[in-house]
Structure formats: C-alpha cells, structure tokens
Amino acid sequence: MGIGIIIASHGKFAEGIHQSGSMIFGDQEKVQVVTFMPSEGPDDLYAHFNNAIAQFDVDDEILVLADLWSGSPFNQASRIARENPDRKIAIITGLNLPMLIQAYTERMMDANATVEQVAANIIKEAKGGIKALP
C-alpha cells in the first residue's frame, strides 16, 4: 500500500508542473497526470481519472492535486471519490509547485502516513510557499 498522486488541471498546466517537479525532485513512481483539454467534456475527464487510478495498486490511497476548487477536474475527482467510498481519496486544490514538492517529500518521509495526514501537511506547506517580495 502507498499513495498514488494524480496531478489534474485545465489544459496542460498539470503536465508542466509535473515536469518541473521532476526537475527538482527526480522522477517519481505512482504519479499520473490528468489534463482537461478544450475539446473535451466531463465524461472524457471522468475517463481520464479512471484510467489514471487504474495505474495504481488497488490498495493504494489516492491524492489528487487539482488546479481549481469547483473546476471540472475537481468536480470529476469528487465524483469518483463519492462513487468509491471504500477507497481513500483526498483532493487538494490550488495546485502549485511547492504543493507538489511537499507531496513527494511527505510520501518519501513517512511510508505509513495516511492520505489524510499527507494532505494536511501539504496544505500547510503550500500556503507557506505563497510569498511576496515588496
């Protein structure tokens, strides 16, 4: 058992942030990218999520890092979570690079952590990654 990570976004943002995360942290196992393209509809996105989840082990918990609360990627991830109550799925929105790096770090540092524990730590760190230089 482990934690599979799905990076999800409108357009190719998820692909780009996945590439950036790999440049900083190296290639990671159990990471899938889900993109929602302009030519696609909600059912296409739903299928993309199911295909991503199928790449993980059946006992893996799942962490979804989505770009926008109430956006289509979030809505379809929420739908899948509701339809699979026996599967632990946590969804975090506001996707940014510090969030992804922290997800990788949390997963590496504590292999026994639950997806809920990992999500709570990610949120704290991701918020701290938003700064301004006067």
Task: Set out the residue ranges of the language-model regions.
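N-terminal loops that bind phosphate or other acidic moieties
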Residues: 2-134
